[in-house]
Swiss-Prot record:
Gene3D superfamilies: Aspartate Aminotransferase, domain 1 (3.90.1150.10), Type I PLP-dependent aspartate aminotransferase-like (Major domain) (3.40.640.10). The lineage of its organism: Bacteria, Bacillati, Bacillota, Clostridia, Thermoanaerobacterales. One of its GO terms (molecular function) is pyridoxal phosphate binding. PROSITE patterns: AA_TRANSFER_CLASS_2. This is Histidinol-phosphate aminotransferase 2. The modification N6-(pyridoxal phosphate)lysine is found at residue 222. Pfam families: Aminotran_1_2.
Amino acid sequence: MVRKALENLKPYVPGKPVEEVERELGITNIDKLASNENLWGISPKVAAAIKEAVDKVNYYPDGGAFRLKEKIAAKYGVTPDNIILGNGSDELVMFLAMALIDPGDEAIMPVPSFPRYEPVVTMMNGIAREIPLKEHRLDLKTMAEAVNEKTRLVYLCNPNNPTGTYITKGELEEFLERVPEEVVVVLDEAYFEFARLFNDYPDGLNFFKKRPNTVVLRTFSKAYGLAGLRVGYGFAPENLAKAINSLRPPFNVNFLAQMAAVAALDDEEYVREVVKNTDEGKKFLYQEIIRMGLSYIPSAANFLMIKTEKPSALVFRELLKRGVIVRSGDIFGMDDWIRVTVGTPVQNARFINELKMVLEIL
């Protein structure tokens, strides 16, 4: 009954929701530091826009999201015809595979990385070529060597999730020189707003504007704080954007999401404050982790990987009992690591205190 390509696919398992932990463990006062969300919340301008829009949710949204596309186009100096929108950027990851992968075609991707690349390629009866990281970074040399006549698509997560490491401008330029122009290279920049603090971090939009078949994906879920509304966006060549617009569901970005995203783009000062606070939070966590005698991977995103020297599933469960939700590294093949979202000062301090207690008993 079910297509063969779907037989071994497993549903994506996100970070545990607060409500689920409350039900399972009967505890309250929970801090979710598992899903790389903006723990500072939404801007006042976004809150006001949502409040104003609520009275209009009885109408269908604009399927073409005209206002939002115009806003993004004006901000980034592209045409609306280059913009693709999704119910989160993960939907755009899927749309790209749907638009480009025929049975037997290949797509190249790093591993561990964002876990939706492989399933969507497999779903289309494509072949996912997963290239392991090298010292926690994308192995661009091996990825370039893996390109062949069957390669249609390359996914580059920059900064990479879960490691937080990033490709530099020079590294990306060298990689793109080695990849044939007919191969679509996707720069997944979900954490762009945080990574641009680094001088050698490449703005994918510059490469989109000068290299054919380059796609850039971004999201309102992270720095903008709209994870619950699900709105991702991207920049694609016009013919590819047209194909994606043809295959997407009619109203894939809902009305509240569109209005919130438009308002979010009007409050860049708030985003800068979130990025500044996150950077300060990371520095605090780095300092405390070193004091504990542990190691970490320096991150260009709003999360970091910490090497606990203990089985990650055990550390995860013990922190969970104490009301702190993190991500267990074993799901990424990093068994003695955990991934933690950078939170508010209170949340960061609580996490460090709870981690100290957990490691003392394990």
